[in-house]
């Protein structure tokens, strides 16, 4: 176990993530820099920006902090992000590609429920079970189910400006 108050060596590793199994598949070796922004006020809870020398295309990337202390190496996950929107520049020697990356919640934020989408009270489905089912259905990220037996007391209908993310958040609230 790392003693975070003592000295250690630190580095970072970046892996492409299989969107089906959600496992690391390939180490990315061409990352020049990375910034992670965590924002509890943002709907998707944060983002990241990666500077690379090659385009990797749209994919999920998992970022790890690697620590070495007293000869013990540990890998600490910092987040998994959907990488997209590359912009590039070339200074004559080095190609620099900046890629924006977003938490997996982006998939739920970009899609809307059909007009009039409703979870009816009569289905007798627990609220958190319904939230889990919808999050799992409309995103590729694994979703951990929450335990709750609370049921709807009335029909729950999506608003015209709801995204799947806002609908699920409102349902679970």
Enumerate the language-model features and the residues they cover:
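Charged- and aromatic-enriched interaction segments used to assemble
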Residues: 93-98, 102-173
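Assembly/oligomerization scaffold segments
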Residues: 1-117, 170-173
């Amino acid at each position: 176990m790392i003693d975070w108050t003592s000295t250690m060596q630190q580095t970072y590793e970046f892996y492409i993530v299989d969107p089906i199994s959600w496992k690391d598949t390939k180490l990315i070796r061409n990352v020049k820099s990375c910034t992670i922004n965590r924002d509890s006020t943002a709907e998707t809870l944060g983002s990241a920006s990666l500077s690379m020398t090659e385009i990797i295309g749209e994919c999920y990337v998992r970022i790890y902090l690697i620590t070495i202390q007293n000869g013990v190496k540990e890998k600490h996950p910092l987040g998994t992000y959907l990488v997209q929107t590359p912009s590039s520049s070339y200074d004559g020697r080095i190609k620099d590609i900046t890629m924006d990356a977003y938490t997996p919640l982006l998939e739920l934020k970009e899609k809307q429920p059909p007009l009039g989408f409703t979870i009816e009270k009569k289905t007798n489905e627990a609220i958190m079970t319904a939230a889990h089912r919808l999050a799992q259905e409309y995103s590729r990220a694994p979703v951990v189910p929450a335990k709750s037996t609370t049921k709807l007391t009335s029909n729950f209908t999506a608003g015209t400006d709801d995204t799947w993310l806002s609908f699920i958040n409102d349902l679970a609230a």
